[in-house]
Each structure stands twice: as structure tokens, then as C-alpha cells.
Amino acid sequence: MKSISIVFPVYNEKENLEKLISSWDESLRLQNIDHEFVIVEDGSTDGTKKLILELEKKYPIINLSQNHKRGYTTAVIDGIYSSSKKFILCTDSDNQIKVKSLIENLNNFPEINEFLVGFRNPRKDPLNRLIYSKIFKILHDLLFNSKLKDPSCPFVIGLKVTYKKLDKKKLLYMKEGFWWGFIGHCIKKNIKFKEISIEHFRRETGEAGYKLKDLIGIVVRNIIGLIKIKIG
């Protein structure tokens, strides 16, 4: 029997979370998959914390809740290191990626020193995020030559032992663009990738993480972070 921890960083996702956990849990039980949900709650202010306490009573949840905001990168890393199953899937809690993408790849799980990564086909995000990603991918390809279609896709499956080979300090270089840095660091560590097409959906409720006015600062910090990973 396969066993997997699903890491969900969560911030103000009260409207999405119950539907998300319910659908994932039902599908995984039908496939007889041993699973747990590692919910890394990040200082939500919309009632998400209270909802998670209720969901804990019904579902296999590890609740990593904090009163302050640690940020996406630290949330993902905390989730990885709190997971107990053989495999770990890291993905987002905005319900833009469905459990179907995991179920369809149960026979395609990665070996050691390998990650199964998604590319959103097609990607259903706001125009400003699509433009930013296309431009930033040019820099990422110049630095790392990853050959991946979608290096920032938040759908990554790997063995726990493979995740543990990564350097937490270097992953923290990318405070706001975690998956770009994650892929770059893996390339530096000679870890391989299998890339799969996954269906991507528009966000039904809530807002995307970054505002347009913050984008210039994010771009500058991410460029510095990628360069530090490259030369580190």
C-alpha cells in the first residue's frame, strides 16, 4: 500500500478548505491509499484556524498552526519536515489543483533522487502572474537549464528521503518564489525530474498571494535568491 503525506500551506482559505480536504480524503480512501494532510496554517484571520480544528475531528490531519505569518517558503519546509509517510506531495490549498492529478499518477511515483513535478496545462491564473512567470522562466532557464515547462508549479511528489537531501538554508533564499528555487536547488544536487501534465482550474474564492504593486520588489528579491542558489 502506498503511503503519502499531502502538505497544504494555508492562509485565509476558509472558503476553500473543507471542500478541498473532503474531496481529497474521499478519493484517497477509495484508492486504499494511506494518507495524512499536513496543514501548515500561516496566521489566518478569516476563521481558517477554527475550521481546521473542526476538520481534525473527521480527517487524518497534522495541524501546524501559528499566530504569526511565517511565509509560504517556511510553511512548505515545516510541512515537509512534519510529514510521516513514505511519499510527500506538496501542493497549494486554493483548490486550483484537484486530487485527480494525484490519482492519475499513482503508478508513476518517483524513485529515490527524483521528483514527479506537474506543469499546469493550461494555467488558469491572472494575466499579471502569467506574464511574470514567462519572463522569470527565461532567467531561470539561463541559470539552471532545467528544461521544465513550468518550474513554479506547486505540485511536487517525492520520497521523504529525497526531500530530506535538500538544504533548508538554501531553500529559504526564495522567500516568495519557493518552487523556482526548489527546482534550481534540485538541479544543483543532481536530482532528476519527471514532468507530467496536470489540469489547472481558476481560483473559485479568495485572492492570489501577491498584489501587482508588490511585484517589482518580489522580482528583485527572487533574482537575488536564484543567483545565491546558483553560486552557493
Residue positions per predicted region:
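Acceptor/aglycone-binding surface of glycosyltransferases and processive sugar-polymer synthases
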Residues: 67-82, 87-90, 99-176, 203-213, ...
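Short, well-formed alpha-helical segments that are part of the catalytic scaffolds
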Residues: 13-28
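Conserved sequence signature across two-component system core domains
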Residues: 10-11, 40-42
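A conserved acidic beta->alpha catalytic loop
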Residues: 41-50, 95
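Conserved donor nucleotide-binding strand/loop of the catalytic core
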Residues: 35, 49-82
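Hydrophobic helical membrane-anchoring modules
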Residues: 1-3, 15, 145, 169-232
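Donor nucleotide-sugar binding loop of glycosyltransferases
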Residues: 13-17, 44, 72
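Short loop->beta transition adjacent to catalytic acidic/histidine clusters or analogous donor-positioning motifs
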Residues: 2-4, 25-39, 60-62
